[in-house]
Amino acid sequence: MVKIGNIELPDFPLLLAPMEDVSDPPFRRLCKLHGADLMYSEFISSEGLIRDAMKSRKKLDIFDYERPVGIQIFGGDEEAMSLSAKIVETVNPDIVDINFGCPVKKVVSKGAGAGVLKDVDLMVRLTKAVVNSTHLPVTVKTRLGWDVDTINIEEVALRLQDAGIKALTIHARTRSQMYKGEADWEYISKIKQNPNIEIPIFGNGDIDSPEKALEYSQKYACDGMMIGRAAIGYPWIFNEIKHFFETGEKLPEPTISDRLLAVKQHAEWSAEWKGERLGLIEMRQHYSNYFRGISHFKEFKTKFLQVLSLEEFYQLLEETEAFYKNRIEI
């Protein structure tokens, strides 16, 4: 068992990463259904929460079926982070997470996300501001450092633990790498070998198969893994990893029927959450991901992108299923 404060997770939990415009309630619900043990919201601007910005407030939506769930906030101002932690607490998530890892320029330029990696003292102050403003367990997601010459994750891990966080997720790249090159998990291993580290350490970066998950779990001895991009359009990865850990065998790849069911559930939940029209418009970014590598889907993609009602959507699902059934690929 792995504990984050008072939150109990199974041995070697699998976490869904907080991903902007992806990790919303419908997607989290689907990942929970397919084996994710702990999920995080899309990251939320502390300044946006304080301004009561509609987009930021909408990201606070959480539901009992997805627990345990954490809400992730980011910012570079101590007072704003403190106030936003108090706002987050009002919706009663299980965890408050701080983003010190987002490498995107618009976030970094505000001195937030991975931008804070340049100033560990500020990182500690921001963390303490959140820890002291909530009774909920506080976790952090960060990177190895700003660039290869300033990797400071070993110092950061100790200082954030001392600041009161209950778990740390490390994306094993620097900010300058963005999402390029290979993640260097050796630093995660070094932190786990430090006898002064008592909090759970979760690894993140490049986990895209059950085989790699098992290899990295054995080689780097982390307490669990966070999965992000590999889950987009493929929520089955969580149960696939768990099954492989338990049996050493791979589950069959999802069939066309499995993929169509996942798309149906995702779209229905999206429509339920945001309204039929907007929910289906936001689904447009997901269709290609669910059918990545499936021959002839391009013929249906254009039609899916034009759907604006569930009635049209259901008709197109039936048409798609019939096409693949006739090709004996379902």
Task: List each language-model region with its residue ranges.
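Flavin-dependent oxidoreductase catalytic cores
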Residues: M1-I330
